[in-house]
Amino acid sequence: MVGVETKVLEIRPLQRISFFNDLYRSGFEAVVIDKGQENHMSMSLFSIIEKPKDTSEIVMNPSLVRSANQFYQALVQHQAFPQMQDLMCKELYGARLLVPVADPQKTTAVPVLTTGKGVRYYPAFTDLVEFGKFDRKHQFGAMEVRFRDLKKYLDYVNGIVVNPFGFALRLDGEKLDRIEKENMKLKVVK
């Protein structure tokens, strides 16, 4: 994959660990230091920060965020492949997501995002950072859901939007059904 040129940004010493932790949340696994010369230095992100050992208690989807960002960047550059979209959908199907609720003790969802054309979306988030972009005033609780749970919200809205202030993946009922059909596997339950 061809790299994307970026601007230089100074990260002050007190912000560096947070910055590198956010890179992990966003799906990065390596850092390349290049001062515009032919030689560059590459290193694993985990030589800078400690990779979380157990993320089972934390809702975080670095692989989904990475695959979605790669797909949308390639789409803008007219270089997207169907396999990139398939990978993003596979990661979404296996993801644990957060949805806002008015009262964390209840499963009734309240907040809805509406487009200028009146299309209503229920937001879902890959992690607490993305959830925080939506709930800046801390008005809502967060409830963990799986992909299969998203369809129940379609009774109230036209679709689901994953990370509305990030890659903003919009999913209507047809797209949810297609992703489920393409990724559903027979599982043996013991």
Language-model-derived ranges and their functions:
Residues M1-K190:
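An interfacial alpha-helical scaffold signature
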